[in-house]
């Protein structure tokens, strides 16, 4: 269960003091600074704001995923994996049900958010304490206008139709010790108990979930041993989870160099309506790469275990109830869904089967859209016979593979903002590390590049960004404008 971060503000100050203070009074100074920031800016800041030209509004909604760019006849679809609605006991500030029924305001926040962020699908991952008590279609919480998705006479999902006609697919699943996504039905009982079935943590449990129609993922890989992952042999593993950044008990496991205390102090500044800070950029303070998870991901692929990676929103709307300067809580469903997502590449109709197949095959990449929407990214291998091999596939070195890549550009560059610095990289898995094998700057990468891998191994593409275009929206937090990942692509495995 996640702890409410507002209650952690004293802890935030203490952690920031412990790790960065130069004097015994640093905690008091930090608290005073934050209080002053929340109350009013100083005169110098006022003058700077007054003198600055008006900035174009930072977009709070996202464009259709197709704007990221079709590749080789496949269309990107924006997918959230690992999200909690009213059938998780800890969602909605711990009140998913009110007076015997679902927390309707919280549910409506969720439904509104999936439309505002132009999602194409959400794979719900509810906790056993509630999902085991209801029929699986109940988890969808369908409302008038929703369309059921039927398979074999059973409801296995639903379409939510947005006001502008866009549709979002909702698919049930669970997160406990294992994370089955895309369940068609409840798993078979264990000892006559559905709760025990949902809490399974062994290969037999993995098999029961697969028989119920799901792909099985391991969530919070930072809390798992590599031996456990090998034994369970899941279909997917998380390589980033925002909860692993903000969870006090796991943040330094997932990201050992991350200063959670300072991050929370910084986030408090986004509450000040006069600060000039754009609240949807609070992610720049909260984010750190989950290096523990990425290390295990490298280990798996270096062993030839081609298990695709996903990013997990782990949205509950229960962690940061503090209202930021836009009048919206810090962890609103909209804000978290806007931060990042998984882009699955689908040829033809987008439906439950095609979404799951793209995830299973690793034909997907993670985009951190908090920094802006990238367009034009592409990564595949081409063998000497001219065949294209997509992310997640295995190719023989004997077939002469060459990587064909194209770096993205910012979809909506806006005057008078500076352009971001972008770099395209290729990494090779070597044990528990991803070692950079090649890189290109943004202009060269955007024109398209080719590179021949020198030896067998697992290779993945990554796009890095220094979001200079966001700098004017972060007065006082310019140090947070730094080199960060924009895209994580799934690997391609080259065998002898």
Spans of model-derived segments:
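Ser/Thr-rich, Pro/Gly/Ala-heavy low-complexity intrinsically disordered linkers and tails
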Residues: 9-54
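Hydrophobic transmembrane alpha-helix bundles
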Residues: 252-265, 407-416
């Amino acid at each position: 269960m996640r702890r409410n971060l507002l209650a952690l503000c004293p802890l935030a100050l203490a952690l920031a003091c412990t790790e960065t203070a130069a004097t015994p009074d640093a905690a008091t100074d930090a608290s005073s600074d934050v209080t002053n920031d929340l109350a009013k800016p100083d005169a110098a800041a006022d003058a700077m704001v007054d003198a600055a030209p008006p900035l174009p509004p930072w977009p709070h909604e996202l464009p259709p995923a197709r704007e990221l760019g079709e590749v080789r006849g496949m269309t990107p679809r924006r997918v959230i994996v690992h999200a909690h609605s009213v059938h998780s006991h800890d969602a909605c500030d711990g009140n998913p049900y009110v007076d015997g029924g679902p927390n309707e305001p919280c549910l409506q926040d969720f439904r509104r958010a999936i439309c505002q962020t132009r999602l194409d699908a959400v794979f719900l991952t509810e906790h056993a304490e509630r999902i085991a008590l209801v029929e699986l279609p109940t988890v969808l919480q369908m409302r008038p206008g929703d369309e059921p998705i039927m398979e074999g006479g059973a409801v296995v999902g639903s379409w939510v139709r947005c006001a502008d006609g866009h549709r979002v697919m909702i698919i049930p699943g669970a997160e406990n010790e294992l994370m089955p996504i895309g369940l068609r039905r409840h798993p078979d009982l264990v000892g006559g108990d559905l709760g025990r079935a949902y809490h399974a943590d062994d290969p037999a449990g993995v098999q029961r979930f697969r028989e119920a129609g799901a792909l099985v993922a391991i969530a919070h890989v930072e809390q798992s041993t590599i031996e456990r992952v090998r034994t369970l042999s899941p279909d997917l593993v998380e390589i980033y989870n925002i909860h692993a950044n903000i969870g006090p008990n796991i943040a330094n496991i997932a990201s050992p160099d991350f200063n959670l205390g300072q991050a929370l102090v910084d986030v408090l500044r986004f509450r000040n309506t006069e600060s000039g800070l754009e609240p949807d950029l609070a992610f720049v303070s909260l984010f750190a790469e989950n290096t523990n998870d990425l290390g295990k991901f490298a280990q798996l692929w270096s062993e030839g275990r081609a298990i695709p990676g996903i990013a997990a929103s782990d949205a509950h709307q229960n962690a940061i109830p503090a209202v930021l300067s836009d009048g919206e809580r810090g962890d609103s469903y909209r804000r978290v869904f806007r931060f990042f997502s998984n882009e699955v590449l689908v040829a033809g109709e987008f439906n439950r089967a095609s979404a799951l197949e793209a995830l299973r095959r690793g034909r997907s990449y993670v985009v951190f859209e908090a920094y802006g929407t990238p367009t034009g990214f592409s990564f595949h291998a081409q063998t000497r016979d001219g065949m294209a091999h997509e992310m997640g596939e295995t190719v023989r070195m004997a077939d002469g593979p060459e990587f064909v890549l194209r770096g993205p550009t910012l979809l909506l560059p806006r005057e008078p903002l500076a352009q971001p610095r972008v770099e395209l990289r290729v990494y090779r898995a070597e044990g528990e590390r991803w070692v950079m094998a090649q890189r290109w700057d943004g202009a060269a990468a955007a024109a398209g590049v080719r590179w021949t891998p020198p030896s067998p191994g697992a290779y993945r593409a990554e796009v890095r960004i220094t979001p200079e275009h966001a700098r004017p929206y972060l007065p006082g937090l310019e140090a947070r404008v730094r080199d960060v990942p924009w895209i994580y692509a799934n690997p391609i495995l080259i065998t002898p």
